Swiss-Prot record:
Binding site for Mn(2+) 2: K263, D268, D286, E347
GN (gene name): pepA
Major subcellular site: cytoplasm
Gene3D superfamilies: Leucine Aminopeptidase, subunit E, domain 1, Zn peptidases
Organism of this sequence: Chlamydia muridarum (strain MoPn / Nigg)
UniProt cross-references to InterPro entries, sorted A to Z: Leucine_aapep/pepB (IPR011356), Macro_dom-like (IPR043472), Peptidase_M17_C (IPR000819), Peptidase_M17_leu_NH2_pept (IPR023042), Peptidase_M17_N (IPR008283)
Entry binding sites for Mn(2+) 1: D268, D345, E347
Name this polypeptide is given: Probable cytosol aminopeptidase
PROSITE patterns attached to this UniProt entry: CYTOSOL_AP
Amino acid sequence: MVLLYSQASWDKRSKADALVLPFWMKNVKAQEAAVVDEDYKLVYQNALQNFSGKKGEAVFLFGNDKTKEQKIVLLGLGKSEEVSGTAILDAYAHVTTVLRKAKCKTVNILLPTISQLRFSVEEFLTNLAAGVLSLNYNYPTYHKVDASLPLLEKVTVLGIVPKVGDKIFRKEESLFEGVYLTRDLVNTNADEVTPEKLAAVAKGLAGEFASLDVKILDRKAILKEKMGLLAAVAKGSAVEPRFIVLDYQGKPKSKDRTVLIGKGVTFDSGGLDLKPGKAMITMKEDMAGAATVLGIFSALASLELPINVTGIIPATENAIGSAAYKMGDVYVGMSGLSVEIGSTDAEGRLILADAITYALKYCAPTRIIDFATLTGAMVVSLGEAVAGFFANNDVLARDLAEAASETGEALWRMPLVEKYDRALHSDIADMKNIGSNRAGSITAALFLQRFLEDNPVAWAHLDIAGTAYHEKEELPYPKYATGFGVRCLIYYMNKFLSK
């Protein structure tokens, strides 16, 4: 995928379907953010009477026989002294939708005068590229006649030399290949994206990148490893489970290793603790954690980061069948810890628990970060714009929070309240898999923390239940799967681990 290009010269730019011109907001009036020819000023001067230049505001105009582009969009960037990376990201995501609705395929984007900004050219271009790439995406559909909006095919950013701009753009395009992979997997039918399909995608990545190795465990191997919790969840489905291990060696001589774990419930009916129909209809997205890990590995290998990372995906359906696991029964995980099943709809934490144990036994992790659409309680707490995360290590928490801030993928640290751990007490097992009807996200995280046992490994748990999938377009994300987490984690690993 090559979409974005750089061109230093305004005069030498190629003809395009549309031109995007930047404006600042100055005393509730629009102010030009870059110098343009008088021919263009004549086109938009009347429109400025009703255009303030506020953040994300876009006005669509038509050119004339003296303009190289026949469609012109005035894009507001807000007040120059207040503009942020996230505002730039959202603005260019929004204008991408405007351009696609106008059926534009080629676009020229004029950069504002960067000297007026509080941040670097690189940061501006990175956020511009991320905005364009984020909404230049179509989710899979099954219409007889495809009604999707046309995609932009070439976007040229004017005012930056290719040596600088193209390097940034190639990096963002590699990153978004991973984001798109995550989105496509989450958006596709659960009958297609089975545990075996996730394993096939992992194998495909290992075939594409020499730096990746993959290991797949089937049901027999899962049982041999005594992963009793994953095996229990898988009992009710005719679809075979898989336990997927991806390994990336970017710095072979280093002992530092990050383990990423992604919940891979490819469809969640709730099991015998059956979900209501309205709650079940989007449950193909319950493997978004697994898809996030696969997307990260796609980007990681493409960008060739000098770090070591292992990805673990416990993958299964949570279905109803004659052999389905039952509430009140006790199952023993790979760790040897026993769990009383208080709800078969609290299955995600069970399969993550076995994955954590596997990581501790075989991977010698420096840190473990897991991703899961784990609790509805997190959606109630933080909605769809922010993912909650828990961490047992302040440095890891601080670095993840910075990565989230820099990429616009909002994270909020939640507390691991020790006294709530008692809600997991069981009279007949080491613990229950569900607490009371309060603080559900916290007790879920405390459940996972138990499986670290006495290991001092740094750990973070990202509950992406609200952020992984949106019922409507919310800038800078498209409708449905968002790919949330891929950009944040790549930024985190690139800045804090690539040393």
